[in-house]
Amino acid sequence: MTLQEKQLGQLRPIDSTAASLYSPGAGVTAIIKTLFIVNTSTSDVTFRVFMDDDGTTYDETTAIFWDVPILANSTVELSSFLAMNNSSGNLAVRTNTGSSLTFTAFGAEV
């Protein structure tokens, strides 16, 4: 079987509250391969990424990236191989400055 990659989710948080970027549907196994974070503001910003396999806890216990700086008007590409197969699970993101970052996840669903 050939995996067909696609955009799994895109989010531009309006505040500094963590929010779900992607959650697999029931019966779906997802592989998240790439996460792009784009800073479209003129200020340096930090971001966090969380992976809660079975819920919505977005803190130190589910963090996979924590307070990573991203320069103004720049892009960060994170390559990974994150598997998700629980429809209650979430890949979530957070920024310290609302309306500054756009997060886009690419991968495959099987």
Give a label for each model feature.
Residues 1-30, 34, 55, 94-110:
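C-terminal interaction-tip segments
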Residues 15, 40, 58-59:
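Short linear sequence motifs
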Residues 31, 43-45:
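Short, basic and Ser/Thr-rich N-terminal targeting/leader segments
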Residues 35-39:
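Carbohydrate-binding surface patches
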Residues 40-42, 97:
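Short, acidic/polar linear motifs in exposed loop/turn regions
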Residues 47-49:
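Short beta-strand elements bearing conserved aromatic residues within extracellular beta-rich modules
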Residues 53-90:
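Intrinsically disordered, low-complexity Pro/Gly/Ser/Thr-rich segments with frequent PxxP/GP/PP motifs
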